[in-house]
């Protein structure tokens, strides 16, 4: 582009500025400056150091039309506009369209170059967008105040630029074409015309400069999974024909809006969809997860159980927890090592959540509190024992009337860690019959000078019960009495299976450890020392 003339005073100032700032300029000053006739008129090309001057309309002075044809601008505008640009105003199609169809400059610039550019209101003011490293002082001849005084004396205005171009009557070298007009008489809702969300899918692509009337691709929103392209507005007149869905090669599904989660707080406004400003986001209420079902294996995996593999067939026929517990009590006599659960909540959990849907492979035994009989006087001990024998006498039942005889009792299997004996001796009397623990950690029996040393307190109390004939557990077959329940249970095996362990002296024993102790005493021919000799 060419700018205009300067006064002689401005020319002198520019000559001094050129000598000082010549290393920063890449122009050929011999070509940029040409003298035409009078020394008061000089034409020059637009370059960066005149940023402060050309930004004002009164500082723009058009040159004569005869000199426009012979002028060529040497400045490279690609670094400013980012697009190829023809300095000749006549060859710019965007300005042709703006003059022919009366479109604003913003539409022509956005379609011809880039939507992000901010188009100038006049073709001459684009030079003011060039930023250089030049710095101007207020005392310079080209400052704002001096340039206003210099150009105001001449009296030219920037509006004369277009009038002089029109008077030139130059022939345009580009082809002419018709631009379709949009008829909006039959459109019920004219807002659809300015809304880019409604775009007909059958509008063909135009070729040539006619594409300037359509929005560029950068103005349209990018498609993603949250956006669906709606159909054409209902009242729009058929400019290019209605969209033909039959010609498509795939099935088009009905568009449905997306509803992302609204994360805004109640104090703030609701979130707006980043895709379309018309789509409101819907807040989704969170749903509580379902409660996990009761699992039999995981809930009772931490409990130790007594397994009865011989009675699996009988347990498989049960249908309720009550029948299962009663059936287990009948076979409790064969349980050597039971389970004692001291927590009372496990018993409630067993009856409420235990699902009896599969054959039972294990049983859970809980502890029942046993009565403790106390006496106030020593004389009442004998009658109390007789009454207690009647109440705790076990019942002998035959199972399937087949030998050997199985005997069941009301007492369930216990571990040795818990008390399985019934003591009818007052605690004060019991405490006076032993002392300890001693230095070695053992207790000493004080009954009639027994002085037996026992390691555990539980065992020394059971030992004192034998001195006082406090044997609450009785055998119905041989009338033998025992202090502890497991001693009676071990005694009953003699009646069922006999004494399986026999010494060489023909003495029989119920347990193997009893036989080994008998042999270690060396009181018979089966002694350990006698075998070695």
Curated annotation (Swiss-Prot):
Main location: nucleus
Subcellular location as annotated: Nucleus
Zinc finger (C2H2-type): 443-472, 473-500, 501-524
Known role: Regulates the transcription of genes required for cell separation.
GO biological process, one term: regulation of transcription by RNA polymerase II
Cellular component GO terms, alphabetical: nucleus
UniProt KW keywords: Activator, DNA-binding, Metal-binding, Nucleus, Repeat, Transcription, Transcription regulation, Zinc, Zinc-finger
Pfam family, one: zf-C2H2
An MF annotation (GO) of this entry: zinc ion binding
Originating organism: Schizosaccharomyces pombe (strain 972 / ATCC 24843)
Protein name in the entry: Metallothionein expression activator
UniProt entry tagged with the keyword Ion transport: no
SUPFAM superfamilies in the record: beta-beta-alpha zinc fingers
Record gene name: ace2
């Amino acid at each position: 582009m060419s700018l205009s003339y300067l006064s002689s005073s401005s020319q002198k100032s520019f000559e001094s500025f050129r000598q000082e700032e010549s290393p920063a300029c890449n122009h050929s000053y011999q070509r940029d400056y040409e003298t035409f006739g009078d020394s008061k008129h000089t034409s020059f090309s637009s370059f960066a150091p005149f940023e402060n001057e050309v930004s004002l309309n009164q500082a723009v002075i058009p040159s004569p039309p005869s000199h426009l044809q012979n002028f060529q601008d040497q400045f490279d505008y690609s670094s400013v506009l980012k697009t190829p640009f023809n300095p000749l105003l006549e060859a710019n199609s965007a300005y042709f369209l703006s003059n022919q169809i009366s479109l604003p400059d913003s539409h022509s610039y956005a379609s011809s170059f880039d939507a992000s550019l901010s188009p100038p209101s006049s073709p001459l003011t684009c030079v003011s967008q060039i930023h250089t490293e030049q710095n101007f002082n207020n005392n310079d001849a080209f400052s704002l105040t001096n340039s206003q005084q210099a150009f105001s004396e001449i009296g030219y205005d920037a509006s004369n630029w277009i009038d002089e171009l029109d008077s030139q009557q130059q022939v345009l070298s580009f082809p002419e074409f018709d631009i379709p007009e949009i008829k909006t008489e039959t459109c019920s809702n004219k807002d659809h015309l300015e809304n880019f969300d409604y775009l007909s899918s059958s509008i063909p692509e135009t070729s040539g400069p006619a594409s300037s009337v359509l929005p560029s691709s950068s103005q349209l929103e990018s498609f993603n999974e949250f956006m669906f392209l709606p159909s054409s507005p209902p009242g729009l007149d058929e400019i290019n024909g209605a969209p033909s869905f039959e010609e498509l090669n795939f099935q088009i599904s009905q568009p449905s809006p997306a509803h992302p989660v609204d994360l805004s707080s109640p104090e703030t406004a609701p979130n707006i969809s980043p895709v379309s400003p018309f789509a409101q986001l819907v807040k989704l209420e969170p749903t509580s997860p379902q409660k996990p079902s009761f699992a039999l294996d995981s809930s009772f995996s931490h409990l130790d159980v007594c397994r009865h593999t011989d009675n699996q067939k009988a347990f498989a026929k049960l249908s309720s927890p009550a029948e299962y517990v009663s059936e287990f009590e009948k076979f409790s006599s064969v349980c050597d090592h039971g389970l004692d659960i001291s927590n009372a909540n496990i018993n409630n959990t067993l009856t409420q959540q235990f699902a009896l849907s599969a054959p039972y492979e294990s049983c859970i035994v809980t502890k029942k509190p046993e009565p403790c009989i106390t006496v106030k006087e020593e004389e009442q001990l004998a009658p109390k024992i007789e009454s207690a024998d009647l109440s705790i006498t076990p019942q002998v039942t035959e199972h399937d009337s087949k030998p050997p005889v199985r005997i069941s009792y009301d007492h369930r299997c216990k571990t040795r860690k818990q008390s399985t004996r019934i003591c009818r001796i007052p605690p004060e009397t019991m405490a006076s019959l032993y002392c300890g623990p001693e230095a070695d950690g053992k207790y000493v029996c004080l009954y009639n000078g027994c002085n037996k040393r026992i390691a555990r307190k539980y065992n020394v109390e059971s030992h004192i019960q034998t001195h006082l004939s406090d044997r609450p557990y009785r055998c119905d077959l041989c009338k033998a009495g025992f202090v502890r329940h497991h001693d009676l249970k071990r005694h009953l095996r003699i009646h069922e299976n006999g004494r399986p362990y026999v010494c060489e002296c023909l003495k029989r024993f119920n347990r193997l450890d009893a036989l080994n102790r008998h042999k270690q005493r060396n009181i018979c021919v089966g002694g350990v020392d006698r075998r070695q000799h």
